[in-house]
Structure formats: structure tokens, C-alpha cells
A protein has these predicted regions:
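Catalytic-site microenvironment of enzymes
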Residues: 1-179
Length: 179
């Protein structure tokens, strides 16, 4: 997690240089009522998202950045509610983990329970909406994050190219306008 914190902080400082008292809104994807897929070891997407978002919030606050935490309790009423709660923030990050379609899953026993997993889809993707108010800044940040992930040995997945136009495919950045 430390490396990912550094990636975000480097990108954030680059994109907000010269701005006084920035505020970052950090949103936890999914909810307790709709927790998303379950991992190969029984953890929900919401749990992964909340854990990572908690690490990110801690790193930002340690760096002296004001943070607006969104949906950490898992009770967000709707998707539209989240950006509304972030309104006025300088930067909005929504943390998600991606699942895969049922037909690509294999099964195994984990602690006496049958769980699913995949070996097909690996890697990362970073999504940017063309409808956001600072597309150029968001693309610079996303590309910088992807480049840092690649230098650390992570691999961007081409999987998202099936449904999304590339913004910077080499660095795992894709357009997704329905964020």
C-alpha cells in the first residue's frame, strides 16, 4: 500500500501545484447492501475498496491534505449521491476493484468453502470520464499513475479495450464516461 500512496501523492501534487489548501474527496466503491463480487478468499469488493481508501485517506492526511471521506460506512444511497457529496473538492477519487464475468471463473476450496477465481484477467486499469471539468489534468494524473505502476512492475490490462476507448493504453488509462 505504501507504494500506491506515493503514486497518488506524486500525481496529486503535480496536478495541484500552486493551489492553496486542496481538498481531495475519496469515495469507497460499492455499499454494504450491494458489496460487489466476492474474492477468491471470501472478501467483498466493498471491503477491498474501503481498506485501500482508508490507506489513501491516512496518507493524504499525513501529508497535510484535507480529505472528504465518502461512503466509508457503506450506506451511500445512489451513485449520483457520491459526486454530489464531493462537490467543491479539488480532486475526486473513487476506489474500485474489478470483477469478471461468470463464464471466466474457475472454482477452488478456500477454508472449506467453494470460492471462484480467475487466471485470465490480471492487471490494472485507470478510468477517466471525458465529462469531468478538468479532463486534461485528470488525464495527466491518470497517465502518471499508470506509468508509476508500470515502473513498479505492475502490468496494465488490455481487457478494458473491449468496451472502452484508450486514453493512454500503454499506461492503462481508459475513457469511461458513465462514471
Amino acid at each position: 500500500m505504501t507504494f500506491l500512496r506515493l503514486i497518488f501523492l506524486a500525481c496529486f501534487w503535480t496536478s495541484t501545484a500552486g493551489v492553496a489548501a486542496p481538498q481531495v474527496a475519496v469515495d469507497v466503491g460499492h455499499t454494504l447492501a450491494a458489496p460487489g463480487a466476492t474474492s477468491a478468499r471470501g472478501r467483498s469488493e466493498f471491503t477491498f475498496n474501503r481498506d485501500f481508501a482508508g490507506e489513501l485517506v491516512a496518507a493524504l492526511r499525513t501529508a497535510g491534505i484535507d480529505v472528504r471521506a465518502i461512503n466509508f460506512a457503506g450506506d451511500a444511497g445512489s451513485l449520483a449521491e457520491r459526486p454530489a457529496q464531493a462537490r467543491g473538492s479539488d480532486f475526486f477519487v473513487s476506489v474500485h476493484h474489478d470483477s469478471i464475468n461468470q463464464e471466466f471463473l474457475e472454482f477452488w476450496d478456500w477454508d472449506g468453502e467453494e470460492m471462484s477465481y480467475t487466471t485470465l484477467k490480471r492487471g490494472f486499469g485507470i478510468f477517466v470520464s471525458r465529462r469531468n471539468p478538468d479532463l486534461a489534468g485528470s488525464l495527466r494524473c491518470a497517465s502518471a499513475m499508470g506509468a508509476m505502476l508500470r515502473r513498479a512492475g505492475f502490468v496494465p490490462t488490455p481487457w478494458h479495450g473491449r468496451k472502452h476507448q484508450p486514453a493512454d493504453a500503454d499506461n492503462g488509462v481508459w475513457y469511461y464516461d458513465n462514471l
